[in-house]
Curated annotation (Swiss-Prot):
Superkingdom of source: Bacteria
Single Gene Ontology BP annotation: DNA recombination
Subcellular location: Cytoplasm, Nucleoid
Protein name: Recombination-associated protein RdgC
Lineage, uppermost ranks: Bacteria, Pseudomonadati, Pseudomonadota, Gammaproteobacteria, Alteromonadales
NCBIfam families (alphabetical): PRK00321.1-3, PRK00321.1-5
GO molecular-function terms, A-Z: double-stranded DNA binding
Similarity annotation: Belongs to the RdgC family.
GO CC terms in record: bacterial nucleoid; cytoplasm
Its biological purpose: May be involved in recombination.
Keyword entries, A-Z: Cytoplasm, DNA recombination
Organism: Shewanella baltica (strain OS185)
Amino acid sequence: MWFKNLTLYRFNKPFAVETEALETALADFTFSPCSSQDVSKFGFSNALGKKGCSLVHSADNRHLICVTKEEKILPGQVIKEALEEKVALIEDEENRKMAKKEKDALKDEIITSLLPRAFSRRSQTHALILPELEMILVDSSSATKAEELLALLRKALGSLPVIPLSFKAPVESNLTEWLKLGSAPLPFEMQDEAELKSEADEGGIVRFKQQDLKEDEVLAHLATGKQVHKLALHFGQSIALLLQSDASVKRLKFSEEFRAGNDEVGTDDPMARLDADFALMGSELVALMHALVAALGGLEDAQV
């Protein structure tokens, strides 16, 4: 359940849907496994996984939701070879060339015949709705997956006025300034990884890892006009992260010491531990968002 990535969105209007109403809305779009002829299925699933019993898990007016996606695996090469074989057979038997429309129809038939025998894979994406911040945090490094989740949530609720998080000043400008100064605003602390890009159309990209970012070798690239587009940071003693210029957060990792804060809860009651971990994570992510917005100079005015 501990989030590993953050794709960030904000509401244009306050989110005022209570837990019970949210649960009811999502219930009409619950996940069901693929049938023999389904290519994929997508829907909401228990927020806390197999041990959970609700689509929404709430604590302190923070709502955790989850979507599950199942996709049939049909290798393109398998379809291509089967199609070529059937096309060759038909063209040989009928002594003619098949039209594109016929080939497309034949391809659909092949896919239909292969679906019942195809393996499938499932993936899950969680999101945390934070009415107090008017934000949604999606645990995904993929903007596409995040948008899929939001699209289904919008369908369930009827409307969802959200936009990607954006700041008054470009994120890369702030990251570049931090690197020049040799430190990030407290409670953030720069680590030993960064990616710098030239703003020129055909400019270069330089990546530093496990290196002191205060060294002249690094700063020399700033002097040539490169800007910082990725920067590894620590948030206090609780979270390690990689902040990117699109305001997304990758490689989010809660420290063992921080997670141990719930050790007194134990593991005898898995649901109690999951609930405690969710409350702990939610509280720290709210603190992280407050600090991030302040460090980056504030959010751009929302467009209603």
